[in-house]
């Protein structure tokens, strides 16, 4: 998994530039300035749940805790350019370890100093020839850096034989193993192979070398939702309605496949050339079974559901809370809970939420349903799942069949000049050298290698292949 978070030396500074900029964004009409509707959520939500949350579900999935602070997207611009430059320098210094074995990205190819292999997959069950269309690093030309995370970088690349443009996540095995994130990384790759939806970024290829893992995905160059929200301040309800409907459709698809995303936030939602949203970054996603709970602490603090914060186990209902926070942010310009990590977590569990009066009654009702502190009472958690959200009166104008056929056009389209356009990416990334930091070799024992059977090639008849091949 490549983390969506940059290293920050001073945690107390996290969120301050973000809060400052959003607070200066577009304001509602003067007649409602400062006039917020304070919800008595004890009436809506009922009393706080008891400490025991295991009555109906078995606790499962004992995983390492992964809690992100609000930061930039891996395949989009960062919040604040000057702040992201500072974080970028800190990240580079942290990752440039002194090691003997080196693999680097340079110019058109990726070179390993001691050994070159186009696809050094340690799959013992099948040879590369048995995987039709298998690719290696020599099949791609590296163009630009478009993101960086805890385990490596994200590049804009061109496939040499077709000239198609992709995003390539390059992740260091030594860092993944060191942080005990191998299971998250394997889950991300496995989950991406099972998804085919018009509003979810697709995995096209995956492979590995001795030192690194590679995920080759759709390159979505309209920027991420936060980038547009940052520039526009907040969205009109009609535009937010389309975006939210597309997000609901994507999350519903995941839940039908038995997958929780667990890190829904504007930085993980991209925009394509037509203005449609594209859900990305499945580094914290988890496959689940009904009537089981994940007992891990994971996600981005501002978007965590109360049950995750309490550490009492969570299920797919946690995603619907995050959708509610996303909608709140789209309509108001900022998430409902701000402050330090600890303060935000306290507010999530205990505080009332204030809804501005300028929002429609229907928007109020939907937010109340999604932001239920008790997961069993949350909209979308019932037997009909996402259908009760889709039938909500705020979505009355949405034709869901047309929406999922990409026939409902958002009123806003990002400025994109072509498939290779990087105008919607922060220059702190695109001006970065494509030279990658050194990487040491992980445990070479094949029995201990957690990355076997990593190679993947997406079949040609996927949804996005059909809809974008003629662009």
Swiss-Prot record:
GO annotations under biological process? cellular response to hypoxia; positive regulation of translation; protein phosphorylation; response to cold; response to heat; response to salt stress
Question: How is the protein modified post-translationally, according to the record?
Answer: Undergoes serine-specific autophosphorylation. Phosphorylated at Thr-455 by TOR.
Kindly state which keywords UniProt assigns to this record, in alphabetical order: ATP-binding, Kinase, Nucleotide-binding, Phosphoprotein, Serine/threonine-protein kinase, Transferase
Q: What class of enzyme is it?
A: transferase
Q: What is its EC number?
A: 2.7.11.1
> Modified residue Phosphothreonine is at which positions?
455
State the signal peptide span: none
Which residues does ATP bind? 146-154, 169
Q: Which InterPro entries match?
A: AGC-kinase_C, Kinase-like_dom_sf, Pkinase_C, Prot_kinase_dom, Protein_kinase_ATP_BS, Ser/Thr_kinase_AS, STKc_AGC
Catalytic residues identified in the record: 263
Q: Which residues form the AGC-kinase C-terminal domain?
A: 396-466
Q: How is its activity regulated?
A: Activated by PDK1.
Q: Where in the sequence is Phosphoserine found?
A: 296
One GO CC annotation: nucleus
**Catalyzed chemical reaction(s):** L-seryl-[protein] + ATP = O-phospho-L-seryl-[protein] + ADP + H(+); L-threonyl-[protein] + ATP = O-phospho-L-threonyl-[protein] + ADP + H(+)
Q: What is known of its domains?
A: The activation loop within the kinase domain is the target of phosphorylation.
On assembly, the entry states: Interacts with TAP46. Binds to MRF1.
Question: What does the UniProt function comment say about this protein?
Answer: Downstream effector of TOR signaling pathway. May be involved in adaptation of plant to cold or high-salt conditions. Mediates the phosphorylation of MRFs (e.g. MRF1).
Q: What is this protein called?
A: Serine/threonine-protein kinase AtPK2/AtPK19
């Amino acid at each position: 998994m490549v983390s969506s978070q940059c290293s920050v030396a001073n945690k107390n500074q996290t969120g301050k530039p973000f809060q400052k900029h959003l607070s200066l964004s577009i304001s509602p009409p003067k007649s409602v300035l400062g006039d917020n509707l304070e919800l008595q959520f004890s009436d809506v939500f009922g009393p706080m749940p008891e400490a025991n949350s295991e009555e109906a579900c078995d606790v499962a999935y004992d995983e390492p805790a992964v809690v992100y602070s609000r930061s930039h997207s891996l395949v989009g611009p960062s919040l604040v350019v000057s702040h992201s430059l500072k974080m970028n320098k800190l990240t580079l210094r942290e990752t440039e370890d002194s090691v003997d074995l080196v693999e680097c990205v340079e110019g058109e190819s990726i070179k390993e100093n001691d050994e070159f292999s186009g696809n050094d997959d340690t799959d013992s069950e099948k040879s590369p020839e048995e995987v039709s269309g298998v690719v290696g690093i020599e099949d791609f030309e590296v163009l630009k850096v478009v993101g960086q995370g805890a385990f490596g970088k994200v590049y804009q690349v061109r496939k040499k034989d077709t000239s198609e443009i992709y995003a390539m996540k390059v992740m260091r095995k030594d860092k993944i193993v060191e942080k005990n994130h191998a299971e998250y990384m394997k889950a991300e790759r496995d989950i991406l192979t099972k998804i085919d939806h018009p509003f979810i970024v697709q995995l096209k290829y995956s492979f590995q070398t001795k030192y690194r893992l590679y995920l080759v995905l759709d390159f979505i160059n309209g920027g991420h939702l936060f980038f547009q929200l940052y520039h526009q301040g907040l969205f009109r309800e009609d535009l937010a309605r389309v975006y939210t409907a597309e997000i609901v459709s994507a999350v519903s698809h995941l839940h039908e496949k038995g997958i929780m995303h667990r890190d829904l936030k504007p930085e993980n939602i991209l925009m394509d050339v037509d203005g449609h949203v594209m859900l990305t970054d499945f580094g914290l996603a988890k496959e689940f079974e009904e009537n089981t709970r994940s007992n891990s602490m994971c996600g981005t603090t501002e978007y965590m559901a109360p049950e995750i914060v309490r550490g009492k186990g969570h299920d797919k209902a946690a995603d619907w809370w995050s959708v509610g926070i996303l909608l709140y942010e789209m309509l108001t310009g900022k998430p409902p809970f701000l402050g330090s990590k600890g303060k935000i977590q306290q507010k999530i569990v205990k505080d009332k939420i204030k809804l501005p009066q300028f929002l429609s009654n229907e928007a109020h009702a939907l937010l109340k349903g999604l932001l239920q502190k008790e997961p069993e009472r949350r909209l979308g958690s019932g037997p009909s799942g996402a259908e009760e959200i889709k039938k909500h009166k705020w979505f009355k104008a949405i034709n869901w069949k047309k929406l999922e056929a990409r026939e409902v056009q958002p009123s806003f389209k990002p400025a994109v000049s072509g498939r290779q356009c990087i105008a919607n990416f922060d220059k702190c990334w695109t001006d970065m050298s494509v030279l990658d930091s050194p990487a040491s070799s992980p445990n070479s024992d094949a029995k201990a290698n957690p990355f076997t059977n990593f190679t993947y090639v997406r079949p040609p008849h996927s949804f996005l292949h059909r809809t974008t091949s003629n662009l």
